[in-house]
């Protein structure tokens, strides 16, 4: 069946033509974790996102396959790096950490939640993957989602998002889950100050 997302819908930032925003209004983290580390299993993915003038920017991502203790230490290091940026005003505050509340994510929420500098929000997905993808589509189509230019991991991200199919015949969708969670949090549920003033 047909692909849901079109790679051409994404906007890009980080070059002379498309400069980096002057600051982030706030930042947040999404995480989608896999239970098993076998070749055919999904990856665990953690993303850092920024919001500026009602648009969503992917800032950084770590993707891999880790057993529970290693997953916790990897995620803790990623979250600490994001949290430490708070010291610079233009980098905005880390406002939220969203972790899928399923399988290994539940364990991560419990163990990381105890040490987290920011409240951890467990994501309990009420809708199926396709519905969440369809909900996210109009926001990407409208040019509200920006990806960083010139970073190695973005190629794999765009490739996976482009390969996502309506009939679930695609191989992996862990990065798609992070994308739809981020859009749901920042663009669907969160009406920014910008939207209230200018729309």
Regions found by a protein language model. Name each.
Residues 1-34:
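ATPase catalytic-site recognition across NTP-hydrolyzing enzymes
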Residues 33, 101-102, 174-175:
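Generic detector of well-ordered alpha-helical packing
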Residues 24-26, 54-57, 175:
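Conserved catalytic motifs of the protein kinase core domain
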Residues 29-30, 48, 98, 177:
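Structured core elements
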Residues 45-47, 52-168:
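Mg2+-dependent endonuclease catalytic cores in nucleic-acid-processing enzymes, primarily RNase H-like
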């Amino acid at each position: 069946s047909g692909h849901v997302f079109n790679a051409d819908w994404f906007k890009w930032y980080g070059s002379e033509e498309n400069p980096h925003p002057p600051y982030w209004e706030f930042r947040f983290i999404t995480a989608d974790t896999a239970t098993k580390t076998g070749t055919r299993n999904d990856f665990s993915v953690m993303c850092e996102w920024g919001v500026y003038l009602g648009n969503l920017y992917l800032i950084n991502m770590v993707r891999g396959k880790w057993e529970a203790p290693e997953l916790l230490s990897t995620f803790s290091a990623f979250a600490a790096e994001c949290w430490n940026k708070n010291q610079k005003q233009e980098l905005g505050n880390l406002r939220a950490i969203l972790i899928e509340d399923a399988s290994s994510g539940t364990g991560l929420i419990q163990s990381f939640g105890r040490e987290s500098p920011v409240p951890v929000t467990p994501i309990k997905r009420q809708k199926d993957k396709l519905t969440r993808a369809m909900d996210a589509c109009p926001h990407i189509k409208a040019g509200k989602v920006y990806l960083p230019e010139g970073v190695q991991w973005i190629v794999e991200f765009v490739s996976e998002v482009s390969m996502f199919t309506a009939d679930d015949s695609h191989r992996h969708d862990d990065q798609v889950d992070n994308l739809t969670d981020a859009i749901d949090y920042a663009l669907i549920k969160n009406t920014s100050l910008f939207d209230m003033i200018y729309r």
